[in-house]
């Protein structure tokens, strides 16, 4: 179920106005007090893209799958307050124990890319693509997708992928079927396939709005069918950003996330997952120069953590992920105080049938080495 469906089908509680008028010091102290009172019964995972005002209270930081797995490994927590976006909280719920409750501090914290693939579109695409290609297609989905899409992929024998293991998972998938349908991020799919030696001519794009396959090649040549989705943040980095940065400083290295366009990834010095970006900067020598193409909150945090290196955003006009930024200190406190009062808000629960099929896709990824 997409975030839009959630908000359409249930009344999403809105944070009371009073939280907007409380002082930062008061709110921070209340969060500290509640965390201390609940102890190990409360667990707060925080995604790398969260604001510092939220991350400072995270019990663990990481990417979406890392955090879901960490939360699932936590046997003591009764409440998991997931500081991320909707699909991440869904994954945490599916991997957690039945007695654990997963909460999202703001139900409006969605992901535009995840919502670019809904079930109606995906069912329709599968029907038309199997008419064209028969039983030669295996679906893969980026973990940045809704529980429904993960369930669809699991039901059809596919698996989930992360930006860290996408290459390994695509290699596996191509041993299973001749062609891959990659959802919902066309750029990660294209960059990964190209890295494996699949030419751009062997890739087609499925336009879910116009319901058509975009290619000028014979269908027999197509190995990758890329869903026409993208990350609204990473698509804003351009080759012009790279050219201007290098013109200003020839010694600077360009490091980007593979959710960027193929042209940007190809023009960069290095591309990799969020963990890869963090580790690369951590291991880089003092005095080295870097322009990073990823979400601004993370870039700012990396800059603050490494004052011995010259680090900047590849696009100085880049804004943070707007939906991720819906989770802020007031919403976090509101969520925690609702638990304290015994009436939790922002409860995330994926139904059993969807969970069963989605776990097929998730677990397949986890066991493939």
Curated annotation (Swiss-Prot):
Pfam families: NadA. InterPro entries: NadA, NadA_sf, Quinolinate_synth_A_type3. Keywords: 4Fe-4S, Cytoplasm, Iron, Iron-sulfur, Metal-binding, Pyridine nucleotide biosynthesis, Transferase. [4Fe-4S] cluster binds at residues 111, 231, 321. HAMAP family: NadA_type3. Belongs to the quinolinate synthase family. Type 3 subfamily. This is Quinolinate synthase. It comes from Bacillus pumilus (strain SAFR-032). The lineage of its organism: Bacteria, Bacillati, Bacillota, Bacilli, Bacillales. The gene is nadA.
């Amino acid at each position: 179920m997409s975030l839009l469906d959630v908000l359409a089908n249930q009344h999403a509680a809105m944070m009371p106005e009073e939280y907007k008028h409380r002082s930062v010091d008061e709110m921070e102290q209340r969060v500290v007090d509640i965390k201390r009172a609940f102890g190990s019964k409360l667990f707060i995972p925080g995604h790398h893209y969260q604001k510092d005002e939220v991350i400072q209270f995270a019990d663990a930081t990481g990417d979406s799958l890392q955090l879901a797995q960490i939360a699932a490994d936590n046997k003591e927590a009764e409440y998991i307050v997931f500081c991320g976006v909707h699909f991440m909280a869904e994954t945490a719920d599916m991997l957690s124990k039945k007695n654990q409750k997963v909460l999202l501090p703001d139900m409006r914290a969605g992901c535009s890319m995840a919502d670019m693939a809904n079930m109606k579109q995906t069912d329709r695409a599968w029907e038309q693509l199997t008419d064209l290609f028969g039983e030669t297609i295996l679906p893969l989905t980026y973990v940045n997708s809704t529980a429904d899409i993960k369930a669809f992929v699991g039901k059809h024998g596919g698996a989930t992928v992360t930006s860290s293991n996408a290459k390994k998972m695509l290699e596996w998938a191509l041993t299973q079927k001749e062609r891959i349908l990659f959802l919902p991020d066309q750029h990660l799919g294209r960059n990964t396939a190209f890295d494996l030696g699949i030419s751009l001519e062997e890739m087609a794009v499925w336009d879910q709005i116009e319901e058509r396959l975009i290619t000028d090649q014979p269908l027999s040549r197509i190995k990758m069918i890329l869903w026409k989705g993208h990350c609204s943040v990473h698509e804003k980095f351009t080759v012009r950003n790279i050219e201007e940065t290098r013109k200003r400083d020839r010694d600077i290295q360009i490091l980007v996330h593979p959710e960027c366009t193929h042209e940007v990834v190809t023009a960069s010095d290095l591309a990799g997952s969020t963990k890869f970006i963090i580790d690369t900067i951590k291991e880089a020598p003092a005095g080295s120069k870097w322009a990073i193409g990823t979400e601004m909150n993370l870039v700012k945090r990396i800059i603050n953590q490494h004052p011995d290196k010259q680090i900047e955003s590849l696009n100085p006009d880049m804004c943070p992920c707007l939906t991720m930024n819906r989770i802020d200190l007031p919403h976090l406190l509101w969520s925690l105080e609702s638990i304290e009062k015994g009436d939790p808000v922002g409860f995330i629960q994926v139904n059993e049938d969807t969970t069963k099929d989605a776990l097929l896709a998730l677990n397949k990824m986890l066991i493939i080495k």
